[in-house]
Amino acid sequence: MAATQYYGTGRRKTSTARVFAKVGTGNIVVNQLPLDQYFGRETSRMVVRQPLELVEMTDKLDIFVTVKGGGNTGQAGAIRHGITRALMELDESLRPSLRAAGFVTRDARKVERKKVGLRKARRKPQFSKR
């Protein structure tokens, strides 16, 4: 393990996260803000910490994240994906446990586009028989 810094790119919905991990004390910084300050909801914070808790490295790595686009849920998911990729770069033997938890796979679900003649992506205008 020659590298002192490990990198992973994570994506979810329209969010993209660039994650840098290095050996440290467990600080997580997102866009120059501490994790607790950046995400108001506890669920988002929990999602970000999931891969670290799974491999029991919560207090062994410092995580520095730059995230753009999307909302809270998308950004949290993108950060989780990025942290997972950085962990795999750090130690490839973590891949099976991370894959079993479902963190390695990129969640490809995106918002479906609105179609012409419909009110939303699939919602049709109200139909009146008479």
From Swiss-Prot:
Protein name: Small ribosomal subunit protein uS9
Gene Ontology MF annotations: RNA binding; structural constituent of ribosome
PROSITE patterns per the UniProt record, alphabetical: RIBOSOMAL_S9
Family the entry assigns: Belongs to the universal ribosomal protein uS9 family.
InterPro entries: Ribosomal_Su5_D2-typ_SF, Ribosomal_uS9, Ribosomal_uS9_bac/plastid, Ribosomal_uS9_CS, Ribsml_uS5_D2-typ_fold_subgr
Classification via NCBIfam families: PRK00132.1
Gene: rpsI
Keywords: Ribonucleoprotein, Ribosomal protein
Alphabetized SUPFAM superfamilies for the sequence: Ribosomal protein S5 domain 2-like
TM spans (from-to): none
UniProt cross-references to Pfam families, sorted A to Z: Ribosomal_S9 (PF00380)
Coiled-coil intervals: none
